[in-house]
Amino acid sequence: MIEISARRVVGSPIGLLSIAASEKGICSIDILSPRSKLKDFSESRNAQEHVDLASKQLNEYFSGKLRRFSVPLDLHGTSFQQKVWQQIAKIEYGQTLSYGKLAKAIRNPAASRAVGGAVGANPIPIIIPCHRVMGSTGKLTGYSGGNGIPTKKKLLALEGISFK
């Protein structure tokens, strides 16, 4: 279980973002809906520094000044999910990758559906840019953050990515 030691809610062009950190780094970003509920936590200075840096970098990303994040992360998931998330983090700003190509990139070409599950379980959207993963035809598929596909469209448009 991840121990959240700092959290901040910040505004963005896609809605409110809840940034949470442990002592090690950012452990989640939630794109909040009006019904979202936040859990209590005990604050730590180290974790607060991670949240401060993530907040600054997200602001720079949304203003078009930042293309690659450098904030420390504290990712928790299965080894398969970790592989998928690490590969997603390599997708360049303004580029996309299909689920099938992502499966090939992790050397598991038959795992497109499992890759989709790992993409949907990404705890740190935007910083781990799962919005850049598309269907094989370039069609927009699901997005678990915020309002779903409309949120994904906004993120892709921000990066100048065309979609169907």
Language-model segment annotations:
Residues M1-A110, L158-K164:
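Basic nucleic-acid-binding alpha-helical/helix-turn surface characteristic of O6-alkylguanine DNA
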Residues A21, M134-G135:
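Conserved hydrophobic "DFG−1" position in protein kinase catalytic cores
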Residues S112-V115:
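Helix-turn-helix DNA-binding helix
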Residues V119:
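DNA major-groove recognition helix of helix-turn-helix
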Residues N122-P123:
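Terminal helix-turn-helix DNA-binding modules in bacterial transcription factors
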Residues I126-V133:
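Short Lys/Arg-enriched helix C-cap and helix-to-coil transition segments
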Residues S136-K164:
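…primarily DNA-binding HTH/wHTH and HhH modules…
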